[in-house]
């Protein structure tokens, strides 16, 4: 399959059926709010390292977590009962993103959370399209995660933990928020054993896209806002 080169300032994507076997769909473009929201609406996300062009992915299968499927282990239940952590939402978004990047770098893994990515997701958060869920202990940020929120879907990006179970508690906080606020799907993007143990599972990309159509609003440029309507997604 070819890899498509995106046109700067033109926030459209090829259909995800054109993605390579590894999920890579396109290269280039920008990290504007409009393009990022359009990407997530259509099952696409950016993932690249410093020095690379922006790479856009849509893997098949897709790892998802439905709020009702969350699995909380016995040890995590014990941590939650002890109330070791205080849960907060959006109180330190930029710090959570920084900590996610620093955690990967400290492990020698490299990171896709570049400075441009940090700025882009910060802009999304200020516009209401991104959130952080945080675990605090003794006045310090102990763990957390950040995600994109569009319509009735969360799109998980990254998580970190400086203390035992802190990121898991943040995920529990996210799921509780989802249950209370009508969020039906949490996109975990790519398989990890950690999330599988907590109830996530893989589904075919085709099914994932069908669910996005029902749960994510379409963009109406004339009104400059997102609303639910019946227009098909570009990536279907």
Q: Which residues does each predicted region cover?
A:
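N-acyltransferase acceptor-side catalytic subdomain
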Residues: 1-236
